[in-house]
Swiss-Prot record:
Binding annotation for 3-phosphoshikimate: 27-28, 32, 166-168, 192, 305, 332
Keyword Transferase assigned: yes
Main location group: cytoplasm
Family indicated by similarity: Belongs to the EPSP synthase family.
Protein name: 3-phosphoshikimate 1-carboxyvinyltransferase
Signal peptide: none
């Protein structure tokens, strides 16, 4: 497996940005569509997939679990139909990969061992393990975390799961359950519901009939069929470029669906509420700075991946912002809540964590040295923070950015940002 690489250290100088970039393909859709292509009997064509380290981990898992993937320029083809166990699957830092792969691996009687890097092996899978066991799978995890060994078959077509920690538990069970022909999932305390909406849209795309009672009960009918479909643009990655426009100029991002279940589409509403000039026309979102931003009091429980960039926007607001609903950030690639507060303090911004609330006293960013803590979204958010700072911002540990947005630096430079990269190292 060849991983994408990026510099270890990046320095972002105060800059004015202007121009248009294309949104990267959605990471969430790419993961789901590749795994569903493995479960569909026949050849699927996934157009415009995201090629990042996280999705390469999924492509590798698909191959090890019995699919025959081929990655070309702007397209991924997968010959699916048979799930094969007996493999050792390395998911790198991708929680989506390992959790969906656990459910898929339970369709084989041969045991599959799944593990990740140090950060992934600290992320919980226990509720998913319990749900798969109740369906008849044999699951042995490590104190509730990876590494985890899974073997099937799945004998029961209905299950309950506690999805308070992560909606990925529900996503894994829905994708695995789609292979059974009929399946029913009861999800308790479902978090980040928009990501389950992405899963349901992906299932429908592959011909699975979906019925639901709110976000509590889901029923599936039919099995996945091969598709020829394209991946939509990613609001999560686009949020960084849109924030750059709100802080330091004017940015347009194309390739974003105006109507989309992605939770991070909320960035558009957030930027408007903070006083940035926002225009949405067709598949283009344009954001322009109007001066200092306005503080907000906002609950991000449904869109936790926006927290790093929302915190940076709050640093440029004139007043105190409160970002709520952030309790689950400690289960991300880093303890994301602590990492955000730590970095803002390093850059001269007053930030305080109170339970699941992050309070930020805005007024601008001084500059200094930030650290990614091994988290791609923290790295990108701190780079954006440097655009309007009083002096440069250096971001250490930038090499994780290709996990989700390999073209981030190139897009930032295309918009006119002054960026210095120190080569070397990798993911």
């Amino acid at each position: 497996m060849v991983w994408l690489r990026a510099p270890d250290r990046v320095v972002v100088h105060p800059s004015t940005v202007e121009g248009r970039v294309e949104a990267p393909p959605s990471k969430s859709y790419t993961h789901r569509m590749l795994f569903l292509a493995l479960l569909a009997r026949g050849r699927s064509v996934v157009r415009r997939p995201l090629v990042s380290n996280d999705t390469l981990a999924t492509l590798n898992a698909v191959a090890l679990l019995g699919g025959k993937p081929r990655l070309g320029r702007g397209v991924a083809e997968v010959e699916g139909g048979e799930v094969r166990g007996g493999a050792v699957v390395y998911a790198a830092g991708s929680g989506t990969t390992i959790r969906i792969a656990m459910g898929v691996a339970a369709h084989s009687a041969e045991a599959t061992l799944l593990y990740g890097d140090e950060s992934l092996n600290r992320r919980p899978v226990h509720p998913l393990s319990e749900a798969l066991r109740s369906m008849g799978a044999r699951v042995c995890d490590t104190g509730g975390n990876p590494p985890v060994k899974v073997s099937g078959p799945l004998r029961r077509a209905s299950v309950e799961v506690d999805a308070a920690i992560s909606s990925q538990f529900a996503t894994s069970l829905l994708i695995a359950g789609s292979r059974l022909g009929e399946f029913e999932l009861s999800a308790a305390r479902l978090s980040s519901r928009g990501y389950v909406d992405i899963t349901l849209e992906s299932l429908s795309m592959f011909g699975v009939r979906v019925e639901r009672e709110g976000y509590r009960l889901f029923r599936l009918r039919g099995t996945p069929k091969p598709v020829d479909a394209a991946v939509p643009g990613d609001y999560s990655s686009a949020s960084f470029m849109l924030a750059a426009g709100a802080i330091a100029g004017r940015v347009e991002v194309e390739g974003l669906r105006p109507v989309d279940p992605q939770p991070d589409r909320r960035i558009v509403e957030l930027l408007r509420s903070m006083g940035a000039r926002v225009r949405v026309e067709g598949g283009v979102v344009a954001v322009e700075s109007t001066g200092p931003l306005e503080p907000v009091d906002v609950d991000l429980d449904g869109s936790p991946d926006l927290a790093p960039v929302a915190a940076v926007l709050a640093a440029y607001a004139r007043g105190v912002s409160r970002l709520r609903g952030l309790e689950r950030l400690k289960y991300k690639e880093s303890d994301r809540l602590s990492a955000i507060a730590w970095n803002l303090a390093r850059l001269g911004v007053e930030a305080r964590v109170r339970g699941g609330i992050l309070e930020i006293r805005g007024g601008g960013v001084e500059g200094g040295v930030a650290r990614s803590w091994g988290d791609h979204r923290i790295a990108m958010a701190m780079a954006v923070a440097g655009l309007g700072a009083r002096r440069p911002v250096a971001v250490e540990g930038f090499s994780r950015v290709p996990d989700s947005y390999p073209g981030f630096l190139e897009d930032l430079a295309r918009l006119g940002a002054r960026v210095e990269a120190v080569k070397g190292g990798g993911v």
